[in-house]
Amino acid sequence: MGDTSEDASIHRLEGTDLDCQVGGLICKSKSAASEQHVFKAPAPRPSLLGLDLLASLKRREREEKDDGEDKKKSKVSSYKDWEESKDDQKDAEEEGGDQAGQNIRKDRHYRSARVETPSHPGGVSEEFWERSRQRERERREHGVYASSKEEKDWKKEKSRDRDYDRKRDRDERDRSRHSSRSERDGGSERSSRRNEPESPRHRPKDAATPSRSTWEEEDSGYGSSRRSQWESPSPTPSYRDSERSHRLSTRDRDRSVRGKYSDDTPLPTPSYKYNEWADDRRHLGSTPRLSRGRGRREEGEEGISFDTEEERQQWEDDQRQADRDWYMMDEGYDEFHNPLAYSSEDYVRRREQHLHKQKQKRISAQRRQINEDNERWETNRMLTSGVVHRLEVDEDFEEDNAAKVHLMVHNLVPPFLDGRIVFTKQPEPVIPVKDATSDLAIIARKGSQTVRKHREQKERKKAQHKHWELAGTKLGDIMGVKKEEEPDKAVTEDGKVDYRTEQKFADHMKRKSEASSEFAKKKSILEQRQYLPIFAVQQELLTIIRDNSIVIVVGETGSGKTTQLTQYLHEDGYTDYGMIGCTQPRRVAAMSVAKRVSEEMGGNLGEEVGYAIRFEDCTSENTLIKYMTDGILLRESLREADLDHYSAIIMDEAHERSLNTDVLFGLLREVVARRSDLKLIVTSATMDAEKFAAFFGNVPIFHIPGRTFPVDILFSKTPQEDYVEAAVKQSLQVHLSGAPGDILIFMPGQEDIEVTSDQIVEHLEELENAPALAVLPIYSQLPSDLQAKIFQKAPDGVRKCIVATNIAETSLTVDGIMFVIDSGYCKLKVFNPRIGMDALQIYPISQANANQRSGRAGRTGPGQCFRLYTQSAYKNELLTTTVPEIQRTNLANVVLLLKSLGVQDLLQFHFMDPPPEDNMLNSMYQLWILGALDNTGGLTSTGRLMVEFPLDPALSKMLIVSCDMGCSSEILLIVSMLSVPAIFYRPKGREEESDQIREKFAVPESDHLTYLNVYLQWKNNNYSTIWCNDHFIHAKAMRKVREVRAQLKDIMVQQRMSLASCGTDWDIVRKCICAAYFHQAAKLKGIGEYVNIRTGMPCHLHPTSSLFGMGYTPDYIVYHELVMTTKEYMQCVTAVDGEWLAELGPMFYSVKQAGKSRQENRRRAKEEASAMEEEMALAEEQLRARRQEQEKRSPLGSVRSTKIYTPGRKEQGEPMTPRRTPARFGL
């Protein structure tokens, strides 16, 4: 280390001297010599080879020639040429001004020459150089001209230009090795942006040439207020130039050489060799052409000499700083060296103006189509009015206009529906609510606010990006972390789907149920049976049953009707002649009661006592008592009209009045009339037994007295706005009070049950030291293993809280229930004749339902019932009994079923409550449209096949037609997708992302085909749940679709219907959809608006439809259903051809033909009507003959007379025996 104490240019950090100062950073000032740099011209150095004399000679010759050329003005000159000429004049003045400036170009060669690659040493001869310059001068004198040559010649010219450029560049490179620096640095200015504004030229205002001014300014550091023009560079020049490249003169090339660095952005250069510009401390990073250097190279020396030591030290510091800047730059550019970092305001302004001119307003395909429609309509109006006349025919007319199909609509009604035949005695529709303006009805329409909030939170939580999970990310893929798929129980080992897996209860019911209440623990099963109220009147009941074929039994909930009646009949010997059947309105009730009775009889479930529900038959050859749903018994009556293998049938919970129950009443009334040995027992928990007795012909009514345990009923003081929140609070209050016993909460539907269960669990987690509570939901769609959990005993010290729909109202005895919380609402299926669809809606319950629910609390001990409505509402706002399902639902399937059972005249069928006339006529009209009924109201072969499918008639028709069209595989998937609720979901906050992903599945012609595409994509992804979540699809709904498809496929196999695929020809699928929904067709009216073809009612495409916002709107569409919200929205829309509608729906539509007149159309319509009238007359004649034959066969009506054959009895038509007196016969 040298002594640096004397050097003031060294920045030094001194240590702390405690005597003189506390500490800090001391920066010594620079010397005056380092503050002010003095630039000195280097001494002239003669060339050893005499090159300086040769260079000055050539320079003088060129200047003389240039002076002569300046006198001749070019026809076209540019601003750049003028600028360069100014630069040349200033150069000339400077060269004449001082002696040091004469050798400036010679002094510019600071760097030592590198070792060149050996090449051709020469350049071109002086003669060729002179000829070339002369040719350029002559060409420039002619000015700029426009060529009208052909494109082919222009391309040749262009290729010659490129060849010439290439040769010229090569010659310049060769020549530059032995020429001056100015010639070696040259290159033509290139630009690729022809129509755009030029990049700004950064020129020093006070500089004559790039060799002066800014490079001689004093060092201003980073904070200098005066910035060099290099610090705001222009965009990097590109390679190409316009067609004038080779037409530039030698002078122009030289000028471009001189002006290049003042116009173009210099690039960064590493300082591995000495660059004198590196001591400029503004860190520009670009190498200027010329500089008047500080140091000078002495003759014969390789190093650099400095005048003072300060200069040397400054130069070394700057070199180190330049090297440091070079290596610290990112990708060769930093904030100062980036050529794209800064631009002048003028350039930015001109660039923005240019882009603004080019900018066009974005127009969507929908808006473009709307504009075209408007323009076409306006043109058509003007032409029609005669204001303007068409002078030219538009040859670019659309082909669609030429081939557009115009449909004519007919209002054809078959003779059996024209009013001459009456089908029902109930003309007005029945509304399932007592007062639509009551508090309960309004709250039911609004729904629960808690449910709405919970739904939004759940969707948001489900759809949020889980950044903390490694699975599915790139890091997770590297580490081998994969997303775990949920196990699919429905898929067997061989990959097939078993849709019965989740519906099988027998496997979960094998275990013996343990007693949980004190009553069940202390008493044996026999003692429990004897404790029931029905045990006291056993003999009286059996006597009445023996004496009468039909008996009405009325008893309160919990009296033992369901479990004991079947056993009493079995013990009385009725099972010797056939099975005892007991119908239940719900599957869970049938399964749980069968299990209880099998335990009381000491057998296994499925042997002596069994049950049969949809998808599962748990019976055997030895079964004597069979519990089943009413739908199962209805299907059995199809195969066997008289139900011969039953000796007694118990219709349990008749007050429920389900659709199947009402149909069974009418059928069993006829069966009992034909079979005197069949016993029919109808049980009900309500007091409307007189209605049942009158229906069956004033049959006896038997009352079972008393209830097992008393129930204390508590009403709410005020109406509850949010029934879910009120139920949660009440359940927590009961639970925390410490009273023993389980809780049963009644809710309207599945979503309400799930929200209530979640809310109870959340509130309990917030409490400290809260007693344990097992929350168990139960509803019909719940898997069987979870449904069976409610019958199992909870661990000791744990209270059960069961949240259920009205599935738990009837025949469901859960041991230990002491508290019932009644929300006061239930879901009912209601038919809307206007849209022709059933809808599940929330309605207030009836008084009969309320009594049933309170009865659940007194089955195994005294209990309490909390009603979340006022006593006034119970008396004034609730109906006495629930409106029967047959009066509020679509009857199409019922009509089909009755027709298939042989009921020709529906008015003669015995309905306990006749259905409304509108519902009946709508259903029969729909069946006639679909071809299930003929013109006389008789069942067709298509209708007989439609009965087998548990589907809406239109979906059944679609499946049947698909077999003929060869696309049954695709239609089976579409029908399955339509049988489940919503497939897609839109979480709040991610609506746009959800819509974008949904658009990927969209098939522009059809929403039905979009559903098909979704299922096929899910299948291709191995039925993945993760794939569903990523694409905002309900995985549970997709699994349900797969189960429905498997079930329908089994039915098709049983009916010997072929399963075929149409491949990628999905037009056949659209035609098949049209065959089932042509009666729900709409045509385009105006812009984006449709109207129903038959009714003229306006319809709108739903925003989620694949056809919504499409550039082309089809003329005709069919839709699956109408949804009434803010507008009449069509859901599940498919574009169809007008000719398909006329072909598949001839009763409504026909194609308008130019050749046919109105008279011909009227004549054809009259012929069709007369043909139908003839058919109807023939059918009426046949019906009359059949009725007369029936009357002859049974003169006493429906009741069959019993004949006792005795000795001496003479039949009609037999000759009398002569030995016997005519008066003596009989006993």
From Swiss-Prot:
Keywords of this protein's UniProt record, alphabetized?
Acetylation, ATP-binding, Disease variant, Helicase, Hydrolase, Isopeptide bond, mRNA processing, mRNA splicing, Nucleotide-binding, Nucleus, Phosphoprotein, Retinitis pigmentosa, Spliceosome, Ubl conjugation
Q: Name one Pfam family in it.
A: HA2_N
According to its UniProt entry, the protein's GO biological process terms are:
mRNA splicing, via spliceosome
- Entry annotated with the keyword Coiled coil: no
* Domain (Helicase ATP-binding) ranges: 542-705
Cystine links in this protein are none
Q: Detail which positions bind ATP.
A: 555-562
Please give the clinical condition linked to this protein.
Retinitis pigmentosa 84: A form of retinitis pigmentosa, a retinal dystrophy belonging to the group of pigmentary retinopathies. Retinitis pigmentosa is characterized by retinal pigment deposits visible on fundus examination and primary loss of rod photoreceptor cells followed by secondary loss of cone photoreceptors. Patients typically have night vision blindness and loss of midperipheral visual field. As their condition progresses, they lose their far peripheral visual field and eventually central vision as well.
Q: What role is this protein assigned?
A: Probable ATP-binding RNA helicase. Involved in pre-mRNA splicing as component of the spliceosome.
Share what the entry says about its subunit structure, partners included.
Answer: Identified in the spliceosome C complex.
Its name, as the record gives it, is Pre-mRNA-splicing factor ATP-dependent RNA helicase PRP16
Biological source species: Homo sapiens
